[in-house]
Amino acid sequence: DNCESNADCHEGLECSNRKCLISFNSDETCSTGWDCVPGVWCRTHGSEPGKCDEDHRCPSDGVCTNPGTECDEDNICGYKEGEPCYGPCRKGLSCRQGTCLQ
């Protein structure tokens, strides 16, 4: 759904990059990380539907708590090159065979 503001989206969704996406810790279910706002991942718990409950956004001080990650220009704590991709890789890297690589 295209949106101009949060008012254009259903409850539990927010307007991000002109799309209505699921907010962090919303009751809405997700099937992939693309359903969630940027920096938030969709996590499944057993056979339950997925929830956008894994937050990888940078803290306000810009210092990520995991030493394998750093705050990138998209304001996401992304895993550095050569690190296992337990979450999003930093901007410019992609997850290949379980490792963040260029």
From Swiss-Prot:
<dbReference type="GO" id="GO:0005576">
    <property type="term" value="C:extracellular region"/>
</dbReference>
<keyword id="KW-1015">Disulfide bond</keyword>
<protein>
    <recommendedName>
        <fullName>Turripeptide OL55-like</fullName>
    </recommendedName>
</protein>
<keyword id="KW-0872">Ion channel impairing toxin</keyword>
<dbReference type="GO" id="GO:0099106">
    <property type="term" value="F:ion channel regulator activity"/>
</dbReference>
<keyword id="KW-0964">Secreted</keyword>
<comment type="function">
    <text>Acts as a neurotoxin by inhibiting an ion channel.</text>
</comment>
<keyword id="KW-0800">Toxin</keyword>
<dbReference type="GO" id="GO:0090729">
    <property type="term" value="F:toxin activity"/>
</dbReference>
<keyword id="KW-0528">Neurotoxin</keyword>
